[in-house]
UniProtKB/Swiss-Prot annotation:
PANTHER family: AMINOMETHYLTRANSFERASE, AMINOMETHYLTRANSFERASE, MITOCHONDRIAL. The lineage of its organism: Bacteria, Bacillati, Bacillota, Bacilli, Bacillales. Transmembrane segments: none annotated. One of its GO terms (biological process) is glycine decarboxylation via glycine cleavage system. This is Aminomethyltransferase. It comes from Bacillus thuringiensis (strain Al Hakam). The glycine cleavage system is composed of four proteins: P, T, L and H.
Amino acid sequence: MITLQRTPLFDVYAKYGGKTIDFGGWELPVQFSSIKEEHEAVRTAAGLFDVSHMGEVEVKGVDSLAFLQRVVTNDVSTLKVGGAQYTAMCYENGGTVDDLLIYKRGEEDYLLVINASNIEKDYEWLASHVIGDATVVNVSSEVAQLAIQGPKAEGILQKVVSEDLKEIKFFKFKNDILVDGIPALVSRTGYTGEDGFEIYCKSEDAAKLWEKLLEVGAEEGLKACGLGARDTLRFEATLPLYGQELSKDITPIEAGIGFAVKPNKEADFFGKATLKEQKENGAPRKLVGIEVIERGIPRTHYPVFIGEEKIGEVTSGTQSPTLKKSIGLALIDVKYAAVDTEVEIEIRNKRVKAVVVPTPFYKRSK
């Protein structure tokens, strides 16, 4: 029997009603109260997520920038200390190794945050391409990560932080902030489509921090949230999930994150030729939004048709808690990607009518 990995917060899940599942080899809470309730809490108040299963890799040394420029698609040279950047790592053919965040903590000090299911693969990929005086260290087991997300997230977190959180702008961070006396890196980032913060601390401090935040946020409606709500929230905001919208067979351009690909940066990076070609002339496939007109929910890998021609497949889909509609993301032939194109999705051996719609499905009002 495979032993599932657990985060430092595993022992407190039960106290808050956590129901755990196997998620990529991790025993993680899919929900605490209900996915719908948690989803709505994040859209209207705030939610707290344990995302300690995510991986963290430190890159340091004189050649750290040159190394990162070689292995990621975005232009790391534009990143200033205290800034975060969304990017991707690609294979030479343009397929995606992973999507990730890079935090610049110092001139020769970067923290990479990678997907849980890819930790070993990513670390090996990075370590096998390291150059010059650059070091790559997997610190995933030492670091815990909590995410507090939603319109009331800032006010709740401010109760246990002395620094003015308004000074931390979107995709910026502060290192060594004390959160209820616990040293942490606090960044204004997230995976929900709402305002919020991600908090990185030592593994041994995570449970105390989790309990404290839920305590001080209770009156504002802060709820413990699981993976189910995290998925429906990111899906509505059209944020890609590796293994669904991104994979070794899907390029960042196809997945709609071309903004994180800078083919004109000086450095030669893996996948540059393919990605440059796709960015300039268009990719053969495109990730689009689809809304089901008839009954049925589109799910991952369901085929999409026009007439008898299979034009692609669904990557993610659900009954949207916010929009109250059955919607999906689908990677389809670019010829059919125009909004209002009528398509059919095969749901349980039955063709169901759907239409291509604009994305993101949800965008918060500023």
